[in-house]
Structures are given as structure tokens and as C-alpha cells.
Amino acid sequence: MARMNRPAPVEVSYKHMRFLITHNPTNATLSTFIEDLKKYGATTVVRVCEVTYDKTPLEKDGITVVDWPFDDGAPPPGKVVEDWLSLVKAKFCEAPGSCVAVHCVAGLGRAPVLVALALIESGMKYEDAIQFIRQKRRGAINSKQLTYLEKYRPKQRLRFKDPHTHKTRCCVM
């Protein structure tokens, strides 16, 4: 059987946050996908495309799969952004340095946009976030998504006040 030429998963690390951006597996390629997740230590997978595989084998391996699909080529809806940032904050405050995998169909649009939002919310400028991701994932983020990220106004949701010093710091530092 001919194997589709898909980009390899890429790790994006920033301030004790680790993301694995990848394409979607199929039931036929699921074992390789699970091996990749284990190699990077990812215990959570965010699936932002339509279902293309059975998540039961991942769950049996202790990997949580979260489904937040949205339209290909489009920016994420507000609810997906809120849920994503809540998950990122909880995951990296609880276990700094852990890894969250996120995938769409090709790993070039929806998944990189969510990672860019996390970088922006933790203090990175949007231009730097895009460049940072594109250095690892060539062709990531289309023009409509670029415009969305340019207009996006962070609320510093991945930062918190230290009750002892009253200074704001990133929750994942």
C-alpha cells in the first residue's frame, strides 16, 4: 500500500509549553501516530478536524482525545479558543513541560493557529508566533488565518498574578 507523503510531526516549545503539531491519522496509520505521541510524551490530543480514526486505542494507552472541529481554512470560533486556552493553562500549570498534541487534516492551518494563540496569550507578538511556527512547519497558517491572528487581542489568559509579589507572570514559567 502506498504511503501518503505527509509532513512529520513538529514540536513547538516555548516557556515550558510543548506542542506537537501533526496531520490526522487514519485507522490504518494509528499505531504510528500513537508511537509518535509516546515519543514526545503527549498525553492529550486535540482534534480540530472531522473524525478520521477511532480514538479508543489512544484512550487505552492513556491518551485523552478532545474533539473541537472547526472549518478548514477558517479561524477558530470563540468557544474553541476559550476551551483551547483553558486546556493549555490547566495542562501546563499542572505539568510544566508536558506535551499537548494538536492536529487538523494536514497540520498546516487549524492546528498551527491554535498553537499560535497559546504563544500570543503567553506574551509573544503575533508576528513572532507565526515566524516561530513557520520555522518548524513550512506553509503553516493561510492568509485568512494570518488576518485573524493579526487582529486577535490577547487577554493574557496564560498569565496569572502571583499572590505573594502581586506581579503578573506566565503560568507556565
Curated annotation (Swiss-Prot):
Changing residue 49 to A: No effect on enzymatic activity. GO terms for molecular function: protein tyrosine phosphatase activity. Inhibited by sodium orthovanadate and peroxovanadium compounds, and by pentamidine. Residues 8-161 form the Tyrosine-protein phosphatase domain. It catalyses: O-phospho-L-tyrosyl-[protein] + H2O = L-tyrosyl-[protein] + phosphate. It is found in: Cell membrane; Early endosome. Disulfide bonds join 49-104. The keyword Ribonucleoprotein does not apply. Substrate binds at residue 110. Residues 171-173 form a propeptide. InterPro entries: Prot-tyrosine_phosphatase-like, PTP, Tyr_Pase_cat, Tyr_Pase_dom, TYR_PHOSPHATASE_DUAL_dom. The modification Cysteine methyl ester is found at residue 170. Mainly expressed in cardiomyocytes and skeletal muscle; also found in pancreas. Consistently overexpressed in colon cancer metastasis. A lipid is attached at residue 170 (S-farnesyl cysteine). The keyword Lipoprotein applies. Its EC number is 3.1.3.48. Farnesylated. Farnesylation is required for membrane targeting. Its main location: membrane. GO terms for biological process: cellular response to leukemia inhibitory factor; endothelial cell migration; Notch signaling pathway; positive regulation of establishment of protein localization; positive regulation of non-canonical NF-kappaB signal transduction; positive regulation of vascular permeability; regulation of DNA-templated transcription; regulation of vascular endothelial growth factor signaling pathway. Keywords: Cell membrane, Disulfide bond, Endosome, Hydrolase, Lipoprotein, Membrane, Methylation, Prenylation, Protein phosphatase. The active site is at 72 (proton donor), 104 (phosphocysteine intermediate). Changing residue 104 to A/S: 95% loss of enzymatic activity. Belongs to the protein-tyrosine phosphatase family. Interacts with tubulin. Protein tyrosine phosphatase which stimulates progression from G1 into S phase during mitosis. Enhances cell proliferation, cell motility and invasive activity, and promotes cancer metastasis. May be involved in the progression of cardiac hypertrophy by inhibiting intracellular calcium mobilization in response to angiotensin II. This is Protein tyrosine phosphatase type IVA 3. It comes from Homo sapiens (Human). The lineage of its organism: Eukaryota, Metazoa, Chordata, Craniata, Vertebrata. The gene is PTP4A3.
